[in-house]
Amino acid sequence: MASGRRAPRTGLLELRAGAGSGAGGERWQRAVLSLEEDALTVSPADGEPGPEPGAQREPEPAQLNGAAEPGAASPPLPEALLLQPRRVTVRKADAGGLGISIKGGRENKMPILISKIFKGLAADQTEALFVGDAILSVNGEDLSSATHDEAVQVLKKTGKEVVLEVKYMKEVSPYFKNSASGTSVGWDSPPASPLQRQPSSPGPPPRDLRDAKHMSLKMAYVSRRCTPTDPETRYLEICSADGRDTLFLRAKDEASAKSWAAAIQAQVNTLTPRVKDELQALLSATSTAGSQDIKRIGWLTEQLPSGGTAPTLALLTEKELLLYSCLPQTREALSRPARTAPLITTRLVHSGPSKGSVPYDAELSFALRTGTRHGVDTHLFSVESPQELAAWTRQLVDGCHRAAEGVQEVSTACTWNGRACSLSVHIDNGFTLWAAEPGAARAVLLRQPFEKLQMSSDDGASLLFLDFGGAEGEIQLDLHSCPKTMVFIIHSFLSAKVTRLGLLA
């Protein structure tokens, strides 16, 4: 009787095994890839076994700027640099940023670490920074207890000259040298994500492929844009959902790489409904999230301010966009996303070709801006297909409108003409300004519908300007904090009202 399971797809590809000491600067091992319904199996190709059991592995020296030059061995890091902090001045060009990627942060119980240095950009040109360097401070601002997002914001706001205080972390550098260059973190590493490991226990370095190894396809990350400088685009990167395992593969040509990526992604997609159901059960049991429904889940590739990229798992609910570095598998992990963007204060500002310099297919990118009490957060993401781009952009816009219709009204304290007031903004009733002096009756000072609003603006600090025309003209409200949250909510209400009238598709 037939089992009902289709035969796995198999093929011969190359697996990146790590940095080599020869002229090539890196080693590739032929491997047989077998795609099954829920897993990917990688086996040594016939005639190309891994090293003999018990064979000595040459120690891998620290690499200058995280990459070996073709035709030369990796230069070892001077021993003196391992013992003391260093100050490195980076001078940024007019375009390109610092040219580094970072990992770690307080939420991962690790310092902020340089995980990749991009060839030819500002950090690389110093010849004084290394993959595995911990960033202790930026222009004197301490990062020793910073979260990943806080560090990104500090680096993003730097000027043309940046002074980095760094210290090389020998214990964790093997993970970042390998993951930054697209190599595997090692099949035999202990069952914990390298980013969540203590620096004192980094685990073994990556090993050659000796036996068949298996990677679960459950919510795996699949990308073809991990080597932007490759003119043939024949590389694949597959990461497990928990971030423990990474496969960096090379196909014979672009068509083969595209075919394999599509086939692997199709299998991942068949498993996604099961993952969605599991997360929905966890979300329903998480008191902070209430009973929100999950509208969409999937991997995005985020463009970082440093110029690198990072896989980001996005979970879209009725009210929020939740972003994670790996698949949350417990209620605690689900309740602690790396970032949260309330949909009512989030705006899709770009979809399609990017105007900036993006090291991957900018045709499949989109940008989001979120108004917060600290200002505006902007994030650029890309996906793997036009279908994904259309689905994400449509659901994000619809989600913003649903959130606006659900909230209906928001209020905030403010000052108008020296008087303490309360501003209420209602999706149907418009703007109402109430007197809010202690002991005074709650009196309406001003009421205007949305239809009368001719222009709105803010100073980015605390002032909101609303122009309703007529005798009243423009009014100035002091919200006592950054007005961006209220500005974005007003935009969401307006957009939802226009869509409700059928003026937008």
UniProtKB/Swiss-Prot annotation:
Localisation per UniProt entry: Cell membrane, Sarcolemma; Cell junction; Cytoplasm, Cytoskeleton
Keywords recorded for this protein, A-Z: Actin-binding, Calcium, Calmodulin-binding, Cell junction, Cell membrane, Cytoplasm, Cytoskeleton, Membrane, Phosphoprotein, Repeat
Highest taxon of source: Eukaryota
Domain writeup: The PH 1 domain mediates the oligomerization in a calcium dependent manner, and the association with the phosphatidylinositol 4,5-bisphosphate.
Similarity comment: family membership: Belongs to the syntrophin family.
GO CC field: anchoring junction; cytoplasm; cytoskeleton; dystrophin-associated glycoprotein complex; neuromuscular junction; sarcolemma
Gene3D superfamilies for the chain: 2.30.42.10, Pleckstrin-homology domain (PH domain)/Phosphotyrosine-binding domain (PTB)
Assembly and binders: Monomer and homodimer. Interacts with the dystrophin related protein DTNA; SGCG of the dystrophin glycoprotein complex; NOS1; GRB2; GA; TGFA; MAPK12 and the sodium channel proteins SCN4A and SCN5A. Interacts with the dystrophin protein DMD in a calmodulin dependent manner and with related protein UTRN; SGCA of the dystrophin glycoprotein complex; F-actin; calmodulin and with the other members of the syntrophin family SNTB1 and SNTB2. Interacts with MYOC; regulates muscle hypertrophy. Interacts with DTNB.
PDZ domain location: 87-170
Function: Adapter protein that binds to and probably organizes the subcellular localization of a variety of membrane proteins. May link various receptors to the actin cytoskeleton and the extracellular matrix via the dystrophin glycoprotein complex. Plays an important role in synapse formation and in the organization of UTRN and acetylcholine receptors at the neuromuscular synapse. Binds to phosphatidylinositol 4,5-bisphosphate.
PH domain mapped to chain residues: 6-269, 293-401
Residues in SU domain copies: 449-505
Coiled coil: none
Topology of the protein relative to the lipid bilayer: Peripheral membrane protein
The keyword Calcium appears for this protein: yes
SMART domains per record: PDZ (SM00228), PH (SM00233)
An example Gene Ontology biological process: ventricular cardiac muscle cell action potential
Phosphoserine modifications at: 101, 184, 189, 193, 200
InterPro entries linked: PDZ, PDZ_sf, PH-like_dom_sf, PH_domain, PHsplit_syntrophin, Syntrophin, Syntrophin_4th
SUPFAM superfamilies per record: PDZ domain-like, PH domain-like
Molecular function via GO: actin binding; calmodulin binding; sodium channel regulator activity; structural molecule activity; transmembrane transporter binding
Annotated protein name in UniProt: Alpha-1-syntrophin
